[in-house]
């Protein structure tokens, strides 16, 4: 399942999902995004505006967490 994790911060809710999912996390703060990447190295992390990313990519995901 492809999951979009908006406003990811440090990934607290990320612990709800197993590693077999393909997860893309969006976080505005570069430092928080870096820390998220360290905690979840298999996820794709986007540094940017979550709302805009959602508008541009919502059709690419099976589940969206906001």
Task: Tell where the protein language model's regions lie, with residue ranges.
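Conserved active-site and SAM-binding loop architecture
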Residues: 1-66
């Amino acid at each position: 399942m492809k999951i979009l994790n908006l406003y990811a911060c440090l990934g607290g809710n990320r612990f709800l999902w197993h590693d077999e999912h393909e997860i893309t996390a969006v976080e505005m703060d570069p430092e928080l995004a870096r820390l998220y990447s360290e905690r979840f190295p298999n996820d794709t992390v986007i540094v940017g505006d979550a709302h805009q990313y959602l508008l541009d990519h919502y059709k690419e995901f099976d589940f969206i967490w906001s």
